[in-house]
């Protein structure tokens, strides 16, 4: 069993200690993340570089988040590929080519800016953190990136990491479709990956 982490925040690695105790997977991640998240594991490979396992190539993409060694990933197998990109305030343009025309995207669309700014439950400092370069992609940020990346080989987009208070699935999908339409990009196979359970199993 293989585990590859994106970063060390508790909401992303909080269950690893329990999972590891039962299944003893090999954890492929940076040692700094093991330390930051206080993970009680000894079977890990301290690596944050490109990795090949069987016929799958795993390419880490540095993200901009307030966590040590945060990463998104590109998974390649033959002519098929998946992008997993969440928990980042922006994406460095030097990775645009690597992220373009992939088969499937799992892509952060965290918040609607207006809902976030008008949310009385979020203090000002937290709003600024979310909106900052080390925060999260808004619906509009996400849509503009995806409009650059979606290509003729793209089959599916899952919008992910939606805020329960500052977003909703209909709004995130609508924002993406509007921007794709403005840019004359014909693509509508879009779903939201919810926090309530797994998505359906799909073949790419």
Language-model regions, residue ranges each:
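Short, small-residue-biased leader/transition segments that mark boundaries at the very start
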Residues: 1-2
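Active-site metal-binding loops of divalent metal-dependent hydrolases
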Residues: 8, 32, 63-66, 86-90, ...
